[in-house]
Amino acid sequence: MEQAPEDQGPQREPHNEWTLELLEELKNEAVRHFPRIWLHGLGQHIYETYGDTWAGVEAIIRILQQLLFIHFRIGCRHSRIGVTRQRRARNGASRS
């Protein structure tokens, strides 16, 4: 008779803890790129729609991920991803 293999992998942190850490990281990143009043409004909408549930947590994670993805895709001025650094003369003169 076949037996299930023993779990020999490393211990994983609980899903709920990981989800809350992800939400915290997304919130910290979002406040660097979006007005707080927008984020507050989003939080209010999620709370009114889902209440204090895991479905609400999952919804706000999904929305924040989409917002940040689109924001970076369009071209965030704060992002250094894919931007080559160019030095400019302070007086506007170009170097040839």
Swiss-Prot record:
Any one GO cellular component localisation term in the record: host cell
Homooligomerization: region residues: 1-42
Cell compartments where the protein resides: Virion; Host nucleus; Host extracellular space
Gene3D superfamilies named in the record: 6.10.210.10, VpR/VpX protein, C-terminal domain (1.20.5.90)
One GO term of the biological process aspect: monoatomic ion transmembrane transport
Domain of life: Viruses
Post-translational modification: Phosphorylated on several residues by host. These phosphorylations regulate VPR activity for the nuclear import of the HIV-1 pre-integration complex.
InterPro entries in the record: RetroV_VpR/X
Entry keyword set: Activator, AIDS, Apoptosis, Cell cycle, Host G2/M cell cycle arrest by virus, Host nucleus, Host-virus interaction, Ion channel, Ion transport, Modulation of host cell cycle by virus, Phosphoprotein, Transcription, Transcription regulation, Transport, Viral penetration into host nucleus, Virion, Virus entry into host cell
One Pfam family named in its UniProt record: VPR
Disulfide bonding pattern of the chain: none
Main location: virion
Modified residues (Phosphoserine): 79, 94, 96
GO MF annotations, alphabetized: molecular adaptor activity
Additional information: HIV-1 lineages are divided in three main groups, M (for Major), O (for Outlier), and N (for New, or Non-M, Non-O). The vast majority of strains found worldwide belong to the group M. Group O seems to be endemic to and largely confined to Cameroon and neighboring countries in West Central Africa, where these viruses represent a small minority of HIV-1 strains. The group N is represented by a limited number of isolates from Cameroonian persons. The group M is further subdivided in 9 clades or subtypes (A to D, F to H, J and K).
Free-text function comment from the UniProt entry: During virus entry, plays a role in the transport of the viral pre-integration (PIC) complex to the host nucleus. This function is crucial for viral infection of non-dividing macrophages. May act directly at the nuclear pore complex, by binding nucleoporins phenylalanine-glycine (FG)-repeat regions.
Stated family: Belongs to the HIV-1 VPR protein family.
Subunit structure: Homooligomer, may form homodimer. Interacts with p6-gag region of the Pr55 Gag precursor protein through a (Leu-X-X)4 motif near the C-terminus of the P6gag protein. Interacts with host UNG. May interact with host RAD23A/HHR23A. Interacts with host VPRBP/DCAF1, leading to hijack the CUL4A-RBX1-DDB1-DCAF1/VPRBP complex, mediating ubiquitination of host proteins such as TERT and ZGPAT and arrest of the cell cycle in G2 phase.
Protein name: Protein Vpr
UniProt source species: Human immunodeficiency virus type 1 group M subtype B (isolate HXB2)
